[in-house]
Structures are given as structure tokens and as C-alpha cells.
């Protein structure tokens, strides 16, 4: 389907706006994935706060110019599915990683975080805000438990020495 100039400009502006406010980006090749599976992926992306769009490569290159994701321009070859995480940096990478496990034809091409290419696997393992808070609380809780154990051990050592 041929796009006229206004449609192309609208797509570039839409993707550029999504890229400007995004925390991270992931590029994938969805060739060979069934329509039902892609529909499911789109639904999951909306729920996770991920902007996802299939874009022509030249339009994608223009859209990311001047953003943190200009480093992705070399990965825009073949069918390009681009996703921008808006709420959590690892959301798109985690979504694509899980989807790739179920669909062997789905291939993650690249991921970018803070203006640099990064491994999608690493990006997918970033904890969410709630997970990070929980980990911090566990560390703080363990630190106080460790302090208690050391205090009790010191008291025991004092009693043994006396």
C-alpha cells in the first residue's frame, strides 16, 4: 500500500514523539509470525505501557534522528518492528524476550538504552520500580538482621572470655 507524503510525515512525527519520551527501545523482526500472535503481542504491549509499531526502514531512520535512539539506524533492515518503553526501561525487552520464547520466527535485532546499543537480555532483566524497592527493603532488612547476629555473637564472646 503506497503512502502519500502526508501519511509518511504523520508516521515519522508519531514515532519521533514516541522515541523522544521513551526510556528504551527494542527493534525486532516479526517475519513469519502469525497474525493472532502479533495481535496478542500488541495487546500485551498496550497493557505494559509499550508503544509498538511496524515501520518502513527509511521512515524509522528519519523518526529516530535527533533522539537517543539514533544508534539503532543500522538495525533498520528487513521488516522492522520497533517498540519504545514508556513506563519502565525493561518493559519492551522483557515483552519481546518472552514472545520470542513462544514464537521461534520472532527475532530481536537490537535494543537501546540511554543512547547506546545494549543487549536485550540485560535490558529485560532490569527490575521494575516495585521490584527494585523490594530488593532494597530486603537488603536493609538483612543488614539489620546481620547486625543483630554480630551483636549477639559479641555478647557471647564477652561472656566466654569472662
Swiss-Prot record:
Protein's UniProt keywords contain rRNA-binding: yes
The keyword Ribosomal protein is annotated on this UniProt entry: yes
A GO CC term attached to the entry: ribosome
Keyword tags: Ribonucleoprotein, Ribosomal protein, RNA-binding, rRNA-binding
Gene Ontology annotations of biological process type: translation
InterPro entries to which the protein is assigned, alphabetical: Ribosomal_uL10, Ribosomal_uL10-like_sf, Ribosomal_uL10_bac, Ribosomal_uL10_bac_type
GO function term, MF aspect, one: large ribosomal subunit rRNA binding
NCBIfam families cross-referenced by the UniProt entry: PRK00099.1-1
Role description: Forms part of the ribosomal stalk, playing a central role in the interaction of the ribosome with GTP-bound translation factors.
Family: Belongs to the universal ribosomal protein uL10 family.
Assembly behavior: Part of the ribosomal stalk of the 50S ribosomal subunit. The N-terminus interacts with L11 and the large rRNA to form the base of the stalk. The C-terminus forms an elongated spine to which L12 dimers bind in a sequential fashion forming a multimeric L10(L12)X complex.
HAMAP family: Ribosomal_uL10 (MF_00362)
Protein's recorded name: Large ribosomal subunit protein uL10
Origin species: Vibrio parahaemolyticus serotype O3:K6 (strain RIMD 2210633)
Gene: rplJ
Amino acid at each position: 500500500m503506497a503512502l502519500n507524503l502526508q501519511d509518511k510525515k504523520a508516521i515519522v512525527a508519531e514515532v519521533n514523539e514516541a522515541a523522544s519520551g521513551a526510556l528504551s527501545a527494542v527493534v525486532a523482526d516479526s517475519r513469519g509470525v502469525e497474525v493472532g500472535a502479533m495481535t496478542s503481542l500488541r495487546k500485551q504491549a498496550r497493557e505494559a505501557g509499550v508503544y509498538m509499531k511496524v515501520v518502513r526502514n527509511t521512515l524509522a531512520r528519519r523518526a529516530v534522528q535527533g533522539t537517543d535512539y539514533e544508534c539503532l539506524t543500522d538495525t533498520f533492515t528487513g521488516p522492522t518492528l520497533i517498540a519504545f518503553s514508556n513506563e519502565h526501561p525493561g518493559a519492551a525487552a522483557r515483552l519481546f524476550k518472552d514472545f520470542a520464547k513462544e514464537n521461534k520466527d520472532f527475532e530481536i535485532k537490537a535494543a537501546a538504552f540511554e543512547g547506546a546499543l545494549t543487549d536485550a537480555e540485560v535490558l529485560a532483566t532490569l527490575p521494575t520500580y516495585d521490584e527494585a524497592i523490594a530488593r532494597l527493603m530486603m537488603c536493609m532488612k538483612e543488614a539489620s538482621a546481620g547486625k543483630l547476629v554480630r551483636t549477639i555473637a559479641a555478647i557471647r564472646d564477652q561472656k566466654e572470655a569472662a
